[in-house]
Amino acid sequence: MNLHERALKVLRASQVFGALGEVILNDLARHLTFQNVRGGTLVLPEGSASDSMLFVVTGGLRVSRREPSGALSLYNEVRPGQSVGEIGLILQQPRTADVTAVRDSCLAVLSRASYEALLSLHPLALNRVFVQTIHDFMSHGAQVVQQHYAQSFVVVPLHDGAGADEVAASLATALRRQGRVHHFKPRLDAEPDWHDDFEGRFDFLIYEAQASASSWTRRAFRQADQVIFVAQAGASQAIGVVEQRLGEEPGFPMKRKHLVLLHPSSMLAPVGVASWRGLREFERIYPLRQGHQADFSRLARFLTGTAVGVVLGGGGARGFAHLGVLRALQECDIAIDLVGGNSMGALIGAQYACDLALDDIRERTQRFASGGERPTLPVISLVSGRRVERDLKRMFGDLTVDDLWRPFFAAACNLSRGVTAVQDSGPLWRAVLASNSPAGLFPPVLSRGELLVDGAILENVPVQAMRERLGTPLEKRRGNGTIIAIDVDVRVGLSADPNLERLSVWRTLKGFFGSGAHPSPGIGDILYSAGHVGGANRRAQTMAKADHYLQPPVAEFALMGYRRSREIAEVGYRYAMEHIEQWTQATPPTKR
């Protein structure tokens, strides 16, 4: 296929020009010039004159912008058949963003002179196209457009024997559940455009790199959308030759970068994860076990934006309904890739992230909740919180949030700054404690001088925190992954005898002991309601951010009804099974 034929093929597939007649398309193709650019090349700098527009013939471009803070944000990808720069060309405005080749690419260029010549030949047809293009842009602005194209990954070993070949093979197996996969082994005889044919035939391309900065490794890197570095758990964290060389590639900042820490299959908990944080700009660090295909399936879902995050809200004993919902998700083979929670949801979620059986979680949680708490001088809080802290330390030991195969976070409220504080690192017991410290009832947990309490003050079901963790730091998009939120909080309005002018301690005590007096709220009721009113008022916003929002009918159970854990879990199970059946009839959630 010669360049003219390739240009025609691209134009026919174009969303902007595809509806034009063959005569106009042939004229347009004859006015195009072609250029080959290497991955990482900046082809249209922000602020430069808009003297041309580009069509992608092969490869791909990426639109990006530096924010005032200096952070890099990635926007649309421009793939074969698509164009970029038409708005600036038509309106004669400077470029509003950088456009960079993310792969070795062949581009067709329409210069301003050619554009004006074509307008004189076909004024009505082309003006109609350009007016529609401007209208669409003014109506919707610059948006991230979801497109179907082959996603590509390069698996790079950071040292000899890192296990990149096993990671690439296991990732290929996992991705085959989502589409067609081709796994490229290292090769030295590849032609410059050898990969173009695979773009249209496969959904996922995996390039297996070498532990050296060979020509194959560099070429594979340039073709990849995402980079997966691989190291053995416990390996040196020093920057090696291959990482240093790839870091010098002009397209390095544009790539989404991940780290896989490969562990022996018999490892009970990950090691070394926390020590890698902050050393590199990795989007995520994935501790994976050799031979555990479920770990690689989770990796595949994160890479492709199809991961499932489950958010567990607070609600005292009603939180046992979470166990029923989790059981239903497991039985329906729905993936749970990331767990987050607040208060009781954090306590259950942390144990679930430890891979404990659901029955064990219920029994451990019931024992934990049955312990009393000693009142203290009410200067900071009503109770000391020492028993809860002691038992959480016993429950989780020396585990940190990083020491989990399944990612987890606990949500708390930072009273010092008035924001949600996501606990996704450090001791696991401490993260759960901060999320289970209602303001006024328990003393706040201190973090570098700031006060952390139960997160329900701001958001009892921390969906926003989950959305941020399912998204990617570089890309501006909302749609990554699926969020299943479980809300077990029951809004009960506080009231007192309408004939009273003020609450009475003695009347409240009489009501507590069942003397027949009109029940008046006690300090525990007041503090609990005050701590949940913010989250309750934002429930509509929280629901809108979740893909599936479950509210098991647990109002009949008391906040402190921990002895009814089996009944509560069963209610959650039956409720979830009914709703999951409705989901699967519409849009099925991601399977494991």
Indicate residue ranges for each PLM-predicted region.
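Cytosolic regulatory regions built on CNB/CRP/Popeye-like sensor folds
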Residues: 1-157, 163-165
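Walker A (P-loop) phosphate-binding motif
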Residues: 145-187, 308-314
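Short helix immediately C-terminal to the catalytic nucleophile in hydrolase catalytic domains
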Residues: 168, 172, 322, 348-349, ...
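Switch II (G3) loop of P-loop NTPases
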Residues: 199-215, 453-457
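Conserved catalytic-core segment of NTP-binding enzymes
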Residues: 207-284, 288, 484
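Non-catalytic peripheral regions of patatin-like phospholipases
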Residues: 254-257, 262-273, 277-280, 291-293, ...
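Helix-rich "cap/lid" substructures immediately adjacent to catalytic or cofactor-binding pockets
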Residues: 292-339
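Catalytic nucleophile loop
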Residues: 313, 335-354
